[in-house]
Amino acid sequence: MRPKDLCCLVLMAGTLLAQPAKLENMQGKTIMLFTPHPDDDTFCCGGTLALLAKNQNRIHIVIYTNDDKGSYDPEMTSERLARIRKAEEEEACRILGIPKENILWLQYHDGMLEYANPRDLVEQTTGLIRKYRPDVVLSIDPGSENVRWHKTDHRMAAMNTIDAIRAAEWHLYFPNQRLHDGLEPWKVPAEFFYYVTQKDANYFVNIDSVVETKLSAALAHVSQFPPAVERYRPDWDPARLEKMKAALRGRAPKRDGHYIEAFRAATGFSEQ
């Protein structure tokens, strides 16, 4: 048998043996979600996170940046916006059922993630994977055709997370984590990627039962919606809130008449 034929058989076996369990039905598992900004997690995965929280899963949200640049308000400062975005993310997670203690802030500046030291960034996130040993990782799809056109933090978060997932399982990557911190290698059993293209989506979570929860969590990010994005105010006018919620509900993705969140499910090396 030629080596390349053997390789194909191994890849096929990996695909057949490593099919992920239904994400939304998992119970008592450890879930890690990596997001470039506070709000990408809510907008893309809020319904799924609410279902996972209801099922008593341990959910850890890793946020690469503090999102301290996204305001048109001329009186806003980066320091103030970072504090606002932190409070908004904590409120969104509370609505979804995730305690604020489970939010891990890496504290990079908005738009600057791509200019961080790549080795240090991979080492940092590899250490988190080894520490929390997730059964599932959710992250931006690194294989998406349009990932290169995403804003800088999205590109870097997608690629860095998948690099960390791969490094985490091999003990010779960042061996100091094992020697000094007692962090053993960890192979992530299942990965689900969000911000997925329509043609690449192969996994859909029905969020009918939690769509209102997701919308409420999304609207906790007050500073990212008008009018607050132009002139910051900390709360919603009630009439505008209901109007915006209706608009978000109307744009929410549906499949066969059901509200859904779309992912690309991948397992190990065979489908990344």
What kind of feature is each model-predicted range?
Residues 2, 8, 18-34, 111, ...:
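Metal-dependent de-N-acetylase/amidase catalytic core
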Residues 8-9, 94:
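Secreted/luminal cysteine- and crosslink-motif detector
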Residues 18-132:
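Active-site rim/loop-helix segments in enzyme catalytic domains that contact anionic ligands
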